[in-house]
């Protein structure tokens, strides 16, 4: 994975090694060979929004007049609300983009706690984007607007993931779970009790006038309006937890929520009326229950303490659920479970004492046991479950889960990896070409009849091969985003196609396809020593996917070829061999240009357009044409 990092943001070339490989300096180029076309990528990368640099328009807050200030940093989730006005669509207006800021701080202008920024996006000539100047209903004018939480629903915090529904409705998730006013005092100045319904016109039916501790007004899903730059309501009836994200189903009634915790919850809410999420029934997932879900009553005390209530009733325990998305092709939900290097006693004591161990974690532990010990786990599934409960499963890489909403069954879709048997990572020269770890962001792209899963990493660490041995400093961390062709049966990490990566020291997140042409991504908390603007959190677009479909399809198809061949990844300017090989690259005069040892992925971004021959140590050849 990290061996050849090539992306629209960060490019690291592979290292050519000339020693100990018996390739002649000159060859006869008249031999016939298979021709591989390396098309010029039609993709265009464009930075749209830079934290700490771009200016956001603010509302009157804490006695300060409305005005402007620099945007917050730590960009995370991206939501998108499509434009529906035909006249605006005809001028290129795409819709409203809204970005979470996971940074928590006291701020006189944008409000304390976390935050969000909203802006409108337009596509102009080709795939060039521009930010649309707007005047909002509250009179603010400009390009970027702070979302007002402080004057509407009370301060928010830890804005991490969220829900970006197909119908344009947006919820932001307040992830980092808070247990006292002392915990929040560093980022929220007013820790006095909060009365529900005092700052929003509609409040929340059934809970208006209820008094709660200030910290208890954090860790909810919060609906926001990107068009007005204001929060609408905290979703008290969905329960209070360390939510990372969720999905709204096509029935416009059913919501699934994912908690980033060890143990973490999988929650479902079903509205009584489509589109009205102020009334309905809440459930927690319990895999061993007959109907897979246990009901949670709509009582404020219960909802505030959802985690302890659900686990006391035997809810299934997950290892840090992150983002999820509905695959509109098959109707199933896919959820990232990022893993935990050292769960310790989290599944055994406290909240975990009465929760149920997830079946897929038992299976993952048994598979790991087989790899490490060379023999099957000797005990029963119950014994393996006890091992997981006792903290024996060090979940270094995480996985992607599949939830079937018709049955309530959760299974592993594919595991991260490959597993490395030592804490010390391999060096670059022996590092695997694909190493997928700690999945976080997840979404889907639908391009010319094909369905692709978009995934992003947020590494929990750099050991255990999550970064090569030479790149173990925090400022050297590189997280990547991948595509997976959903037509592949029983996929593994080896089926992934790298599409972009973040600048050093950051995580890549927010990935969303706003249509068949453009994907948006965020880079969060990069190393401050990076070149501007990549030393800031930022939002960027990669456009032109509709012109790349054939090349992407060929990439996935060619990976199963048993003969010596190569297949292009024009997204990342990489040429991937179908097996690890020693190779030499020759120009069409027969002159040796490059030699590589033990490689499977070759950087071709520095080759001038033209024809070349690739020869392996067995003398097998393929011809590539770089456009």
Model-found features: residue ranges?
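Sequence/structural signature of beta-propeller domains
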Residues: 20-549
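Intrinsically disordered/low-complexity terminal segments and short unstructured peptides
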Residues: 16, 353-355, 521, 549, ...
């Amino acid at each position: 994975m990290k061996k050849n990092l090539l992306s629209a943001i960060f490019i690291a070339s592979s290292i050519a090694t000339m020693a100990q490989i018996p390739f002649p300096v000159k060859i006869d180029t008249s031999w016939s060979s298979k021709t591989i076309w390396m098309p010029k990528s039609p993709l265009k990368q464009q930075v749209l929004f830079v934290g700490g640099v771009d200016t956001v328009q603010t509302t009157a807050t804490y006695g300060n007049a409305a005005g402007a200030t620099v945007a917050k940093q730590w960009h995370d989730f991206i939501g998108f609300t499509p434009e529906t006005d035909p006249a605006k669509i005809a001028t290129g207006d795409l819709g409203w983009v809204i970005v979470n800021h996971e940074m928590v701080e006291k701020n006189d202008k944008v409000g304390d706690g976390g935050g969000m920024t909203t802006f409108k996006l337009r596509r102009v000539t080709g795939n060039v984007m521009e930010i649309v100047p707007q005047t909002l209903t509250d009179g603010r004018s400009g390009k970027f607007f702070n979302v007002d939480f402080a004057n509407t629903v009370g301060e928010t915090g830890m804005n991490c993931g969220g829900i970006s529904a197909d119908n344009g409705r947006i919820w932001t998730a307040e992830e980092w779970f808070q247990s006292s006013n002392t915990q929040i005092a560093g980022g929220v100045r007013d820790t006095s009790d909060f009365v529900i319904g005092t700052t929003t016109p509609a409040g929340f039916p059934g809970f208006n006038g209820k008094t709660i501790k200030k910290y208890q007004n954090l860790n909810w899903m919060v609906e926001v309006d990107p068009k007005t730059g204001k929060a609408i309501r905290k979703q008290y009836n969905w329960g209070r937890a360390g939510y990372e994200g969720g999905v709204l189903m096509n029935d416009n009634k059913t919501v699934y929520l994912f908690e980033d915790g060890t143990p973490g919850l999988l929650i479902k809410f079903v509205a009584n009326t489509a589109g009205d999420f102020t009334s309905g029934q809440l459930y927690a997932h319990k895999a061993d229950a007959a109907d897979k879900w246990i009901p949670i009553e709509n009582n404020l005390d219960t909802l505030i303490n959802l985690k302890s209530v659900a686990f006391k009733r035997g809810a299934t325990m997950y290892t840090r659920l992150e983002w999820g998305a509905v695959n509109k092709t098959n109707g199933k939900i896919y959820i990232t479970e990022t893993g935990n290097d050292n769960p310790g006693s989290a599944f055994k004591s406290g909240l975990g004492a009465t929760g149920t161990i997830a079946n897929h974690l038992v299976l993952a532990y048994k598979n790991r046991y087989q790899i490490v010990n060379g023999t099957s786990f000797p005990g029963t599934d119950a014994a393996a479950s006890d091992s997981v409960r006792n903290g024996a499963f060090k979940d270094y890489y995480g996985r992607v889960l599949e939830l079937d909403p018709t049955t309530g069954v959760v299974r592993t879709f594919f595991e991260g990896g490959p597993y490395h048997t030592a804490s010390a990572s391999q060096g670059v020269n022996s590092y695997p070409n694909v190493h997928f770890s700690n999945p976080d962001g997840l979404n889907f792209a639908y391009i010319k009849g094909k369905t692709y899963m978009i995934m992003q990493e947020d590494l929990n660490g750099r050991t255990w091969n999550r970064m090569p041995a030479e790149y173990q400093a925090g400022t050297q961390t590189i997280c990547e985003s991948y595509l997976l062709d959903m037509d592949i049966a029983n996929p593994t990490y080896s089926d992934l196609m790298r599409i972009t990566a973040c600048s050093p020291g950051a995580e890549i997140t927010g990935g969303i396809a706003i249509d068949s042409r453009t994907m948006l991504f965020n880079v969060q908390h990069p190393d401050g020593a990076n070149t501007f603007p990549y030393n800031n959190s930022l939002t960027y677009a990669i456009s032109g996917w509709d012109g790349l479909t054939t090349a992407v399809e060929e990439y996935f198809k060619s990976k199963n070829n048993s003969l010596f061949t190569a297949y292009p990844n024009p997204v990342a300017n990489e040429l991937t061999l179908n097996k690890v090989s020693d190779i030499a690259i020759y120009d069409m005069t027969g002159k040796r240009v490059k030699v590589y040892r033990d490689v499977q992925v070759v950087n071709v971004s520095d080759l001038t357009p033209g024809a070349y021959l690739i020869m392996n140590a067995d003398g097998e050849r393929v011809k590539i044409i770089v456009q």
